[in-house]
Structure formats: C-alpha cells, structure tokens
Amino acid sequence: MSISKLTASNLTVTLGISMRSGYTIWGTALIFYLVFLGWHENWRGPLTESEIAIFTARAQSINGLSAEQLAHFEMFMRDDDGGEFFMVNLVGFTEGPASHPETGAKVDARELVQSYFRPFAVKILARAGYPAFSARTLSGYIEAWGVAANPGWDIANLMRYRSRRDLLMSATDEDFSDIHIYKRAAIAATFAVPSQSIGGALFS
C-alpha cells in the first residue's frame, strides 16, 4: 500500500472518530438541555378551577390572613398565565437579638431566619424556584412618597418561581407551616409582591 493511500485511510479514520466524538458531545449537551428545560419550565399550564378551589381552602385555613389578602390571593390565582414570575420581597429584621420561638433563647435574627429559609429553599429549588437577586440595603429611602415610613429594611430579594402552582404547593405545604415560626420571630417587617418581568438586562 502506498504512503498516500495510508495517509488518506488514517485521515478517514481520524475524521470518523472526530465526528462520532462530536455527535456524542452535542448529543449529551442536548440531553442535559432537555432535562434542564423539563425542570426549569412549567409544562402544566395555568391553574385549573379545581386547583384554585383546593388552594383557596388551604389559604383560608391559614391563621393571620386578612380578607384583603385572601382577595389578592384569589386574584393572583385566577390571573395565572402559566408563566414564571418573581416575588419582590423586602425584609426588616428585629432590632437586637430575636427570641427563639421554641427555646426562648436570644439569637441573631439573621441566623434564626435561616432555620426557615434553608428548608424552604430546598422545597422551591425542587420546583425550579431560586433567588434571582439578593442584596442588603445601604440606606433609608432616597426617594419616596405616598408610602409608609421606612420600618428599617435590611434585605431586598427577588425569588424566581416556575409557576404560581409551584409557589402555592410550597407555601401551603404542612412542613412549611411548621417552620414559618422562625420567620415570624426573626423578621419585624416584610412585604412580598408577585411580579412579572417586562424587560431589563437580567430578566428579559
């Protein structure tokens, strides 16, 4: 066999191996991407009427929710488009040490709230929910009108949820209600507003 034929044969084998390796890499990448999409996106559509009825009953059983909150809760469910959303959340911790709800011991509020957040984060991560943004405040309001006085906000958060169903399944979970006492004890003031992205560099 001539050298030129040997070289051509070796080149063909090398190209064949390279192509198979390329197919393997791209095939693996495609599988991972499809698995990611299956986890990250909501494939079940908006809430159904039966789901709304179930979650409404669960919400009504939660102590401390006002009639206004329940009305907002129902509107939030009925306006569901099946898409992702972000929960805008401001948090103000208790001044000084917080009282542990079980032992009464004085503990750091930021450490105490982790007893709530860590288990909750695990639950929502399983449903493709995660912190999209978290930051500490640097001062009081720079600009504000028509709002109540700043109660002392410490943290600003944006939590991403795959769907309203996923939030409601987590928020009405019995295990979640058991750990909510840590959040109540550690946080002096908070509000949470569900929002949907309309653009921007991070969330477009």
Task: Name each model-derived stretch.
Residues Y182, I187-A188:
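Catalytic cores of eukaryotic secretory-pathway lumenal/extracellular enzymes that build
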Residues I155-R160:
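Active-site scaffold segments
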